[in-house]
Design a protein with these regions (language model features):
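Functionally constrained cores in energy, signaling, and assembly domains
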Residues: 16, 27, 38, 50, ...
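Sec-dependent signal peptide hydrophobic core
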Residues: 25-33
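Surface-exposed flexible segments
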Residues: 31, 37-39, 219-225
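N-terminal secretory signal peptides
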Residues: 1-20, 34-35, 41-43
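Basic side chains
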Residues: 18-19, 23, 205
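Structured, non-membrane catalytic/scaffold regions adjacent to prosthetic-group chemistry
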Residues: 44-280
Length: 280
């Protein structure tokens, strides 16, 4: 996994000027053992100025609240996240339904990981969460299961973007089983040691550091184990542009733009782009 320098971490007043971000990086460094899953890049970073906490919470892709980057921050303020339950079902021996309180009772840790958007921008975020495998191990996955599907809540009354057919709602994403069980595939419940903001996917989302950001579903209500590859939202909308796997790869361009470089959010619009690293 890629190690970030302290100066590269997206700060909130330097994270209250007293937190050490690097303790979270040790998790998983010796645990990346699944040969079929790419390793997050470990080369030295060339990030410049860090982005701000304000940017993390005001510059978002979350089409359920609108297609503009500022729409989620403006429109998600009154989004209801309590009560909230999440179901784990499908090809499992022990289907499970957990309240958000039960999910939050699972021990979390800080994980400093870079989000790389398919649009060609990035930011480094200190997430709070735990490995998805901790949930999946509770349900005893059946041998036939090959994929894990994530489903976002459908609530057009509050998620105004769902009133329009921008995507096929509810939002669906998915992973192979081995990807889902990777220790760095994270159930995110917060950032900067705080509760996850609504515009960032509250009350819980998935984050997969070696994949483009759209693979990380937000406001999840169902996790389903399947034999067939899930019909994911963006693949369904434009299969030639947004593939199922969508690993960060500077050598494979999007049909409409290069993926060789990225813009660091928070830097000047005139700042040079940085090279994108394989698997982020």
């Amino acid at each position: 996994m890629k190690k970030f320098k302290y100066s590269e971490i997206t700060p909130e007043k330097i994270y209250h000027k007293r937190r050490s971000f690097m303790r979270s990086i040790s998790y998983g460094l010796g645990a990346l053992t699944l040969s079929s899953v790419p390793l997050v890049n470990t080369k030295a970073s060339n990030l410049n100025e860090p982005t701000s906490y304000d940017n993390i919470t005001t510059y978002n892709n979350y089409y359920e609240f609108g297609t503009g980057k500022g729409d989620p921050h403006k429109r998600a303020k009154n989004f209801t996240t309590r009560p909230w339950n999440i179901k784990i079902e499908g090809l499992v021996e022990k289907p499970l339904e957990l309240s958000i309180e039960e999910v939050l009772s699972i021990k979390s840790e800080e994980r400093i990981l870079k989000l790389r958007c398919v649009e060609g921008w990035s930011m480094v975020i200190p997430w709070l969460g735990f490995s998805l495998s901790e949930l999946l191990n509770k349900v005893q996955i059946k041998p036939k299961a090959k994929f894990v599907e994530f489903e976002t809540v459908y609530n057009p009354e509050e998620m105004v973007g769902q009133r329009y057919p921008v995507l096929n709602w509810p939002y669906i994403e998915g992973l192979r089983i081995d990807e889902a069980m990777h220790p760095l595939t994270t159930v995110v419940t917060g950032l900067y040691g705080k509760t996850l903001p609504n515009q960032n996917g509250a009350p819980l989302r998935i984050f997969i550091p070696w994949k483009y950001g759209f693979k990380s579903a937000k406001a999840i209500v169902k996790i389903r184990l399947t034999e067939k590859m899930p019909n994911t939202a963006w693949k369904n909308a434009s299969p030639k542009e947004y593939g199922f796997y969508s690993n960060v790869n500077p050598e494979v361009d999007h049909p409409r733009w290069s993926q060789a470089t990225e813009r660091v959010i928070g830097e000047s619009i005139l700042a040079p782009r940085i090279k994108t690293l394989m698997f982020n």
